[in-house]
Amino acid sequence: MAFEPIDLEQLVTDMKAAASGVLKMDVATLRGFSERQLKAIAQQASLVATGIATKQITEETEQFFLDSLEDMALSFVRTLRGLLMVTIEKVWNAIVGVLWNAISKAAKVVLPVPVLGN
């Protein structure tokens, strides 16, 4: 069994392809989620502004509506953070999978591929 050196350029290309595949798929999901959520938050802000301007929202209830907007924004950001963390794990898993497979092939051994998040 002869050692088979790793083609570094190919390895870099394979890692980029693995990461890009995950990112393209997840970016579409993130983009759709973000667009819907931000539109809903913007619409709510518009309703609050109209309510304040027309006095339908009183001084007594104004803070309640503003706090609700803050909560919507915080919920959006927290959900986005969670989705991004999942995407980062997927990218890490894809890159490590490529690396471990390249090492296994070059060294003619079978290495168990670690998985982040398990």
Give the positions of each predicted feature.
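Cationic, hydrophobic amphipathic alpha-helical membrane-interacting segments
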Residues: 1-118
